Amino acid sequence: MGQTFEGHLVAEGLKVGIVVGRFNEFITSKLLGGAEDALRRHGASEADVDVAWVPGAFEIPFAAKKMAESGKYDAIITLGTVIRGSTPHFDYVCNEVAKGVGALNMSTGIPVIFGVLTTDTIEQAVERAGTKAGNKGWEAAAAAIEMANLSKELSK
């Protein structure tokens, strides 16, 4: 039988970039808090976590690409909140952000984690930012830690 590879949840020594959309900041700030908490609890130092704020979710892939291209990071976490309104704008933004982050994840050589909430209501977003449904920022950070370590294992 061949090898089994797993990424471990140890953030010590990992350099992580976080891109956060400012639109719906009352939600995204909670996602950021969750991500920072997860990174700290798994051993990351404050000095190893950089945060870039962008105007909204649509701008997230651009900043994530710049961070990835810098070569300084083991993983990038993207955080944002898009809440459905009465126009098709929601669909356009969600599709482009998801495609942009997915493309970066496949092309940059480092994990780029999608932590952007796409919800029908404000209540759903609040639930996913630290109340009933956990904190998706925390979950995105845990995925980033695991994938950064898995990437290192697979590169040996």
Swiss-Prot record:
GO terms for biological process: riboflavin biosynthetic process. Keywords: Riboflavin biosynthesis, Transferase. It catalyses: (2S)-2-hydroxy-3-oxobutyl phosphate + 5-amino-6-(D-ribitylamino)uracil = 6,7-dimethyl-8-(1-D-ribityl)lumazine + phosphate + 2 H2O + H(+). Pathway: Cofactor biosynthesis; riboflavin biosynthesis; riboflavin from 2-hydroxy-3-oxobutyl phosphate and 5-amino-6-(D-ribitylamino)uracil: step 1/2. It is an enzyme of class 2 (transferase). It comes from the Bacteria. GO terms for cellular component: cytosol; riboflavin synthase complex. Its EC number is 2.5.1.78. One of its GO terms (molecular function) is 6,7-dimethyl-8-ribityllumazine synthase activity. CDD domains: Lumazine_synthase-I. (2S)-2-hydroxy-3-oxobutyl phosphate binds at residues 86-87, 128. The active site is at 89 (proton donor). 5-amino-6-(D-ribitylamino)uracil binds at residues 23, 57-59, 81-83, 114. Pfam families: DMRL_synthase. Forms an icosahedral capsid composed of 60 subunits, arranged as a dodecamer of pentamers. Catalyzes the formation of 6,7-dimethyl-8-ribityllumazine by condensation of 5-amino-6-(D-ribitylamino)uracil with 3,4-dihydroxy-2-butanone 4-phosphate. This is the penultimate step in the biosynthesis of riboflavin. Belongs to the DMRL synthase family. This is 6,7-dimethyl-8-ribityllumazine synthase. It comes from Halalkalibacterium halodurans (strain ATCC BAA-125 / DSM 18197 / FERM 7344 / JCM 9153 / C-125) (Bacillus halodurans). The gene is ribH.
